[in-house]
Amino acid sequence: MAAGLSIFRVVSNDELARQEREQSDRALAERQNSELMLGIVSHLRMCWDAAKIAKKPIEDIMLKAMRQRNGEYEPDKLAAIKKQGGSEVYMMITEVKCRAAESWLRDILLDTGTPPWDIQTTPIPDLSPAQTEEIKAAFADMVAQLLQTELRAMTLAEQAQAKEAVAQEYRFKLLQAAQNRADRMKLKIADQFAQGGWAESFNDFITDLATYPAAIIKGPVVRRQRTLGWEKDESGRTVAKPLDKIAPEYERVDPFNFYPEPGITNIRDGYCFQHHPLTRTMLSDLIGMPGYDEQAIRRLLQEGNGTSWINQDVKLIKEEEERKYYTEMRPTEIYDALEFWGKISGKMLREWGMSEDEVPDPALEYDANVWVCGDYVLKAVLNYDPLGEKPYAKTSFIKCPGAFWGKGIPEIIEDIQNVCNAAARALVNNMGISSGPQVEVNLERIPANEDITQIYPWKIWQVTNDPTGSSAAAVRFTQPETNAAELMGVYDKFSRLADEHSGIPAYLYGDLNVQGAGRTSSGLSMLMGSAGKAIRQVVMHIDSDVIKPIVTRQYVYNMRYDDDESIKGDLQVVPRGAINLANRETMNVRRIEFLNASANPLDAEIMGPDGRAALLREVAKSLQMPADEIVPSRETLALAQRASGGAAGAPPGGPGGQQAKPTPTHPDGSSKGGQQGNVVTTNASGGAA
């Protein structure tokens, strides 16, 4: 070989791809088998086992609630009924009450035309250092102007009064600006709710609330959304274009898939798990999302799912109750993933290999979010919320103090449902027995070929003489007594008790058999108002436990990540579900009465155009009319007032805004001095003035 020549090794594309895969596999193995990841997985398994065992009694209650709504007996009770024989009828009282409660809550919270929440300014907006300096500058300008006009310095009392006047005027303008920001923030959140599936999730949440010991909703959670966009092609035609964007979404969490830490009362008190049954499409959608391990997801898609975290027996029973039959034969592969939200001690994180920069204080607890699927950790990050809040909100139809799980309607009226079922079964059995006679046949007097198992009209009975010479009939008929009236009385009594125990009276969903005051329209209105007290407590639970925290989290999300600075400000979330519970027709009448009563010059001077416009907006919204198209916005009104106010709004006293000095007058009001002072008039005493 000649000197100075070198040999280059040529590597094929397949070889390069193989080397890249091997390098990626080594990096994935090192990452997944690191001391930190192994420690996290071990800790999560211990927490999961405790939460799964503690959830078992609640799962039994929820399965019983599903059967109760579906009109099915418990397996042991159904076996006893079949052993005894007779009717297996099931009266659907629970289903009727649950549907009525759902309809009532949806009418209050979803069908009012306005969202059950509002964004308002705080009573006293916080002043930033820059705004404080603006107030000081305005006060200095006032002092300088007074020195120019009055040629004297202000006293201490005048300084304090002037400073307070400047601050009040500034705060008033600040409140107006904050209200404009609040309106824009409200529109922004309403748009995010519409695109993020809030209405659908909240609708399912209400069904869970009426049925199970707790209902849970999740959000905002940042996910990839596939939307349809429109653009012009080369020929100028409008064509569809699929778009992918990252945006907040909301979802109803199945109570069967939520596992809280044993012994906690609220979600914020401890850790929790959510079980995710993921299809391949749902799992692949996580690729490219912030915080997820793309290589682990791709490896999982290649290998398939081999670990089941949940109780398969409970899963199959639940799916059958939901009329999802033979799901084990489903060809689509389902991956069982667990999502963990909770605290991990800094000491454990240090022991698992995290540095002092990542974990400054080992004595503190750090909020973490971890996804585990199969043998892989898909995501392990610290909680992105500045206060460590978890993206869940839950409440119950009836809350039990100190307990995480409350009670749903099926659990509340379970005993009543059982009594009504027993009365209905006895009634049906008694009706069957008493529907015809009991037949007694003397076999000694019946020919051998006579069929005594059938009875029908006009049947001819062949009999022989009684060998003993008795005159008794060979065939005797006995009519059993009917107890239908007594059994119906028992059923009616206990079905009325279901109204009282559930707080959902029958006349709310169209029962016309109302006695007493309910026979008149005003009396029925009073009864419905009284019945509203029971549901008001449930609505207050939804307001405080679900609507306010969810909307507040969306507000914080927009404050942190939205680029539009015009929506940001010192604002607060006000839930309005309990307010919507009031009779809307009565409220609309009262609003219109107030609108007419305030249509006079005195009230107009007090309210001003802004106040009148605010009143018109509320009336238009309550009538489900387009308020923004009927009443101009605050900015439009302000521009119109400035445009028309020009000279009319100039300060009195001529140019410069100087106040004209008052003209000296006599005690009777006439002017002193000048041309008017030279006019002689007669005063009240008859003398000249």
List each model region and its residues.
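Extended, helix-rich architectural segments
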Residues: M1-D367, E486, D492-K493, G686-A688
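Generic, well-ordered alpha-helical scaffold segments in large soluble proteins
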Residues: K188, Q192-Q195, P220, I416-N430, ...
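Extended, charged amphipathic alpha-helical segments
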Residues: L338-G518
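Short coil/turn segments at secondary-structure boundaries
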Residues: E200-D208, G219-V222, M431-L443, L508-Q515, ...
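Long, highly charged low-complexity segments enriched in Glu/Asp and Lys/Arg with interspersed Ser/Thr
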Residues: G608-G653
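Short, charged/polar micro-motifs that form catalytic or ligand-binding hotspots
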Residues: R171-L175, Q179, Q192, G196, ...
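Extended amphipathic alpha-helical segments with heptad-repeat/coiled-coil character used for oligomerization
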Residues: P220-V221, L228, K232, R519-E618
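Long, low-complexity, intrinsically disordered segments
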Residues: A660-A689
